[in-house]
């Protein structure tokens, strides 16, 4: 991208990447990544990868997607424990904060958490044969590691959804917010 010459292009150029802590698998095996430890003495392959990625560009970089799914199934395991699945929602929140801090510490131009709300249309190799493709968007599949990334979920209840996004907060009474 740096080699594209632009005239009268005030905004400039930037690079964007999807950077997840569990993929590519080399994050679990690359020696220098495994030797990268944070201030708490924990292995941090994510920040090592971010630093390496910066070497490919002289323009600003935005992490256009980063996240962790809370699916029951697991597609990739991370040496950091930041797995693609088998993570509870509290851990997901803590991991998102940590990944964003890594992005900031690496002096990236920004990061965008994936995703605001769960996407039910996603599928994965481990269960694609067990769903009906044209009906996939209509039901959540907790097994699918490409779902359950959302900060906001739309979980079905026994007879109705458990929470309506309609401005009436009475269905959330007694729920302690994560942040205010």
Explain the meaning of each model-derived region.
Residues 1-6, 46, 90-102:
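Short, acidic/polar
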Residues 180:
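Surface-exposed, glycine/proline- and aromatic-rich loop segments on solvent-exposed faces
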Residues 2-81:
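Glycoside hydrolase catalytic-domain groove-lining segments
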Residues 11, 107-108:
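Short loop/turn motifs at secondary-structure junctions
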Residues 78-81, 91, 102-107, 113-177:
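Aromatic-rich peripheral "rim/lid" segments of glycoside hydrolase catalytic domains that contact
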Residues 10-12, 59, 95, 113, ...:
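Generic secretory/membrane-interface signal
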Residues 18-20, 66, 95, 112-116, ...:
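Broad hydrophobic/π-residue packing in well-ordered secondary structure
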Residues 37-38, 83-92:
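A short acidic, glycine-rich active-site loop
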């Amino acid at each position: 991208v740096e080699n594209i010459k632009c005239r009268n292009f005030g905004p400039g150029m930037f690079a964007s990447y999807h950077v997840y802590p569990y993929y590519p698998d080399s994050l679990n095996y690359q020696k220098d990544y495994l030797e990268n430890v944070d201030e708490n003495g924990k292995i941090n392959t994510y920040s090592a990868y971010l630093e390496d990625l910066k070497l490919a560009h002289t323009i600003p970089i935005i992490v256009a997607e980063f996240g962790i799914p809370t699916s029951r199934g697991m597609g990739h395991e991370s040496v950091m424990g930041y797995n693609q699945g088998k993570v509870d929602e509290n851990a997901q929140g803590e991991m998102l904060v940590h990944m964003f801090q890594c992005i900031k510490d690496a002096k990236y131009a920004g990061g965008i958490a994936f995703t605001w709300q769960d996407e039910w249309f996603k599928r994965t190799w481990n269960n694609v044969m067990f769903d009906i493709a044209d009906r996939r968007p209509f039901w959540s599949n907790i097994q699918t590691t490409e779902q359950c990334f959302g900060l906001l979920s739309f979980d079905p209840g026994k007879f109705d959804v458990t929470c309506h996004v309609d401005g009436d907060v009475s269905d959330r009474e007694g729920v302690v917010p994560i942040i205010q």
